[in-house]
């Protein structure tokens, strides 16, 4: 067995692990990334596409925002379609100029992987039998890669390996508490190389169920419709999908909708999930390893980024100043923001979807609530503040700015 030593072992090379690695690299902190999947698989995963303002700022501080600046699509508002009428929520006007940016998680991942490769940083892909050990005292990571067995001795382990990863599963059950809500429907999503139906996202509340008109670029669109959990992708031809989407849109949007062959089609179940705490001795959980949100609020990737903002700040503070304050506060600070994002994502999901179990009274109440929100500046402000992203509880991210 080959033994290595480093300061931080990062398990998982999704956006959370890669972003943490990039920020640690900028601060001169040694680290290694261990990933079970291949680099090609990681780079090709199709995920979220909306970045909060604070996530964009964090990628800039990490020095990986060149493509984001060139190809990202800033959006200052969203549209909500209900009862056949569209209402625009002016995000920027309601949040002192803040906005969101359309830039796919796939592109964020590729940018971070390219920066890592150019810097010649150590990553192990296609790692087998990844295990973490003794993370309350002397952390170690063991795995096999290309026929060689490795042991990494480190100061800390960052568990960025997703919902099904080994890190959370390695925590003793009496040390961890989980909270979960599974929703009784999924999203059937289609990716197509057609221009978007509108310049901004359209969220649809309809009698036939939720729909979302989104995009990845000016020439690639992403559309979703609510379907039962029992449904299967094989049940939907492209023509059937487009027809059902039109049934949920207003006449103007139907007229503008450009259809075409799908290049990806899948059904994603919706769930809310939170782990408490997010730190176990010298093991930190971040991103999907610690929490899942339904995609309605566009918070999954952004929560991973905020976790990494707190974690990188804490580690930089520890290695540059010898302070453990950030480490000790990591879980508490993250969870404050996580639960607010969970609330917003749950609220958006509940407000815009049809539940089979809801009564006509429940349905009328939801319509009244949405009508109130859209007709009230205060209501729209609440939605907008959460949508563009709540601020980080870090003093201007001073440590990260210094690291960059």
Curated annotation (Swiss-Prot):
A UniProt-annotated Pfam family: FAD_binding_3
Cross-referenced Gene3D superfamilies: D-Amino Acid Oxidase, subunit A, domain 2, FAD/NAD(P)-binding domain
Cited SUPFAM superfamilies: FAD-linked reductases, C-terminal domain (SSF54373), FAD/NAD(P)-binding domain (SSF51905)
Marked site positions, Important for catalytic activity: 203, 387
A GO molecular function held by the record: 4-hydroxybenzoate 3-monooxygenase activity
Keywords from the named record: Aromatic hydrocarbons catabolism, FAD, Flavoprotein, Monooxygenase, NADP, Oxidoreductase
Role: Catalyzes the incorporation of an atom of dioxygen into p-hydroxybenzoate (p-OHB) to form 3,4-dihydroxybenzoate (3,4DOHB). The reaction occurs in two parts: reduction of the flavin adenine dinucleotide (FAD) in the enzyme by reduced nicotinamide adenine dinucleotide phosphate (NADPH) in response to binding p-hydroxybenzoate to the enzyme and oxidation of reduced FAD with oxygen to form a hydroperoxide, which then oxygenates p-hydroxybenzoate.
Subunit structure: Homodimer.
Family as reported in the entry's similarity comment: Belongs to the aromatic-ring hydroxylase family.
Protein name: p-hydroxybenzoate hydroxylase
Organism: Acinetobacter baylyi (strain ATCC 33305 / BD413 / ADP1)
Source species taxonomy: Bacteria, Pseudomonadati, Pseudomonadota, Gammaproteobacteria, Moraxellales
Encoding gene per record: pobA
């Amino acid at each position: 067995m080959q033994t290595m030593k480093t300061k931080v072992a990062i398990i998982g090379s999704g956006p959370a692990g890669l972003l943490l690695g990039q920020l640690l690299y900028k601060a001169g902190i040694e680290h290694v990334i261990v990933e079970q999947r291949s680099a090609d698989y990681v780079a090709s995963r199709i995920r979220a596409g909306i970045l909060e303002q604070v996530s964009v700022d964090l990628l800039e501080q990490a020095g990986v925002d060149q493509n984001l600046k060139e190809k990202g699509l800033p959006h200052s508002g969203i549209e909500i379609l209900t009862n056949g009428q569209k209402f625009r929520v002016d995000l920027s006007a309601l949040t002192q100029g803040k906005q969101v940016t359309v830039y796919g998680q796939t592109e964020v991942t590729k940018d971070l992987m390219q920066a890592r490769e150019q810097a010649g940083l150590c990553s192990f892909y296609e790692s087998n039998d990844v295990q973490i050990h003794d993370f309350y005292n002397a952390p170690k990571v063991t795995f096999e890669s290309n026929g060689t067995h490795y042991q990494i001795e480190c100061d800390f382990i960052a568990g960025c390996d997703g919902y099904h990863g080994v890190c959370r599963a390695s925590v003793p059950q009496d040390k961890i508490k989980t909270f979960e809500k599974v929703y009784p429907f999924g999203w059937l999503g289609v990716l197509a190389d057609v221009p978007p139906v509108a310049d901004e996202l359209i969220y649809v509340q309809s009698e036939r169920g939720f729909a979302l008109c989104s995009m990845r670029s000016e020439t690639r669109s992403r559309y979703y419709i609510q379907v039962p959990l029992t449904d299967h992708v094989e049940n939907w031809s492209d023509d059937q999908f487009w027809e059902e989407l039109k049934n949920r849109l207003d006449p103007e949007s139907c007229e503008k909708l450009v259809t075409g062959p799908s290049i990806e089609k899948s059904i994603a179940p919706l769930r809310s999930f939170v782990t408490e705490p997010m730190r176990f001795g010298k093991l930190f959980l971040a991103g999907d390893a610690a929490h899942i949100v339904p995609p309605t609020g566009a918070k999954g990737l952004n929560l991973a980024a905020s976790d990494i903002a707190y974690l990188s700040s804490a580690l930089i503070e520890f290695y540059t100043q010898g302070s453990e304050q950030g480490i000790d506060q990591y879980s508490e600070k993250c969870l404050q923001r996580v639960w607010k994002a969970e609330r917003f994502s749950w609220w958006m999901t509940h407000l815009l979807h049809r539940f089979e179990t809801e009564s006509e009274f429940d349905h009328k109440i939801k319509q009244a609530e949405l009508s109130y929100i859209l007709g009230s500046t205060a209501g729209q402000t609440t939605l907008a503040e959460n949508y563009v992203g709540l601020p980080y509880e870090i003093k201007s991210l001073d440590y990260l700015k210094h690291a960059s």
